[in-house]
Swiss-Prot record:
The gene is STY-26. It catalyses: O-phospho-L-tyrosyl-[protein] + H2O = L-tyrosyl-[protein] + phosphate. This is Tyrosine-protein phosphatase 26. One of its GO terms (molecular function) is protein tyrosine phosphatase activity. Belongs to the protein-tyrosine phosphatase family.
Length: 117
């Protein structure tokens, strides 16, 4: 989360499920909806989750104090849910839908912050 704050990232893309076939694939690094979690000196609040067919879009508020500067960010996480562990998705339609939603946000934000994948 410190990297997100330091780089002022406003988009995170996640292509894996946390669990698949009973096996952990990725750590869940965000809180439940309307909850706040602390990660070191960074506080993350899950403000909203919107479930689209094939992916979830989350709005996360991130706050931290770095070198006596308070930083507050609002970012979007795009979590793709249709990518199987093996082999590849049967269709690209859900991934393309998520990509279009992400690109729209990038175009509207007019920032040059990096996208975290």
């Amino acid at each position: 989360w410190l990297m997100i704050v330091e780089q002022k990232c406003n988009i995170i893309v996640m292509l894996a499920k946390c669990y698949e076939n009973g096996t952990r694939k990725c750590e869940k690094y965000w809180p439940e909806p309307m909850k706040t979690s602390q990660f070191g000196s960074v506080f993350v609040t899950n403000v909203e989750e919107m479930d689209f067919c094939g992916f979830v879009q989350r709005t996360l508020n991130v706050s931290a104090e770095l070198q006596n500067n308070k930083i507050n960010l609002t970012l979007k996480q795009f979590h793709f849910l249709k990518w199987p562990d093996h082999p590849v998705p049967l269709s690209t339609s859900h991934l393309l839908k998520m990509h279009r939603a992400m690109r729209k946000l990038v175009d509207e934000s007019k920032t040059s912050s990096p996208i975290v994948v």
